[in-house]
């Protein structure tokens, strides 16, 4: 048997790797090569890799204790990890070695990769950003820990039935997770409900005691996060809810089996599913439970780890920093105060001083529905002691506000954590701002916007608290891993330094003038498109032309992301092609993919519209060699890894002022796609780095939208443009759904009679004109390829490594180390 943990990757042979995999197959999977299924082989490979990781994992964690480092704790309700096998192999530097070893065993590596389920513990960009940041923190040797929830079911599996989205459970744990280790020794009680008893103890100290509670246990599961090209292996710790009582035999013995298992199920529901439907009271309560469950277990774990090597808590703020990934974990501020004041018996002022140094808050949105504001009655019932703590935080905070702005009740109201009104609410964003050392936006535009609008009065109170850290993506997954052909071309041309220092991509800009290099670049894109064509056929049974323009709009379905505007443009083009069938146009394949929240009726209707339009367009022989429309179901990280390398045009068309940053825009441009988009989020900074002339920018600016909102009349746009009117008429007349002609009338009503809140019609003409410029350029392959190269060359700033260096330097105050060993 191979002692795999002692291997040096530079000395490992294909044969020894093969023997190590076979050892795991025999001893861990208990199968022989003759009878093993592809999943068995995948599991054997994963367990082999885990053995490789174990040595670095232990060394890293022991080193953190030995050196008494300051640790970063990244709290997030979402982590969209995707698949881990290839990523781990790449970061360990043994991807080719394992591929060759499997080939000697007559197994296709790429087929085995498909055996792994996506770890879909997230909903969209928030969770994927968290995953990129974990990768970068490990690569930069930041002593960091991710903390989240081990959902039994992640984001739902999306199925398209008769054009409609239907949700099915995402059973990502059906075959187990080979990357996790259960840490049964780390089991923490989390208490809900109950009542608070205040009394003076025998020492004369005021005590707040929470009694008659419902207790849930949080069980730790650890996933290793290896850095690229170093020996650092950090941890992602996920919590699973468990009942403290187990099976109640008293119920069972009295014939009440249902009650016996129901009590357990209700408690364990906390970690059952990502984001329950919070449009109903029960869903709201479960979601608030999830958020407190995460922060309570995590803060207890942080304190345990600190006190393992420190006698008292005096230096806690010197050794601990917590980053809140949006408002979901903002309860951590109240929980830290609860532990420091109620359990550790620190004076309030000292505990608050420590807490406000430890915590930092990343804001990801200005959309009102995404800013958490919990009803007071729900909060009081579920977390009575924490409500008292928040009241005390708010009272002391408003005293400061009153001192700065005497007799100004409007200021007190707008800056209060507790919102008054018909239904009192706890404003979690305000709590996060008041309780954090730093508050950051995620693009320069978004950071300015929150200072000017959302947190304007907070910014006026303490401007030094606000900072920008523009998002980034990991070049390991989003170029080296997902686009090996492009990575190979880059390696041969400029070396592979860009994988750890993305700014090195700027070196390829000069090669845009080299016709031979452009030919190689075009060849890479065509082969990637051919691969995507095969995947499309396997997914939805449609044959598409790889020489057509691949126009991709893949992201969460939401009105502000304006998939509706895109499909209205498609209908516009379809009408034009029918009227002028002989015109010289660029054959285009429009690809949509994304999930709508289960309770978001309009978003789900937009999915139905896209599929209905696709049915009509793709079956119309007059146009289907010029225009094809596809909706690829069940969008996820692994699907994005196939779509992005084969994309020609990236749709980033949100209503200006509503997209905080976006990271899909970065991934597409990194892989040579050209961007059509508004001046919103990170598009603005991309235009600065790539060159606005190398993007297709259109639409109203955020300040223009603010002005237009007062007097906007979408009907006048239809009155002035009969072609746009014709598009809406087709929807109203039921052209795309003859079985139910009224089906899409709510969309028309939303646009014409509910004020078109996302300015779809206001930007539609400009959007159509921008697409005409796209078509003109695509007819000139050399010019298109040059700009494609410029796009990739200009993306050096948008690395998650750079973002983490910004956090480490400006917020966390911890050192980072590059793969070359250089520190800062």
Swiss-Prot record:
Its EC number is 2.4.1.1. GO terms for biological process: glycogen catabolic process. Pfam families: Phosphorylase. GO terms for cellular component: cytoplasm. This is Glycogen phosphorylase. NCBIfam families: P_ylase. InterPro entries: Glycg_phsphrylas, Glyco_trans_35, Pyridoxal_P_attach_site. SUPFAM superfamilies: UDP-Glycosyltransferase/glycogen phosphorylase. GO terms for molecular function: glycogen phosphorylase activity; pyridoxal phosphate binding. The keyword Membrane does not apply. The modification N6-(pyridoxal phosphate)lysine is found at residue 667. Its cofactor is pyridoxal 5'-phosphate. It catalyses: [(1->4)-alpha-D-glucosyl](n) + phosphate = [(1->4)-alpha-D-glucosyl](n-1) + alpha-D-glucose 1-phosphate. Keywords: Allosteric enzyme, Carbohydrate metabolism, Glycogen metabolism, Glycosyltransferase, Pyridoxal phosphate, Transferase. Phosphorylase is an important allosteric enzyme in carbohydrate metabolism. Enzymes from different sources differ in their regulatory mechanisms and in their natural substrates. However, all known phosphorylases share catalytic and structural properties. Coiled coil: none annotated. It comes from the Bacteria. Belongs to the glycogen phosphorylase family.
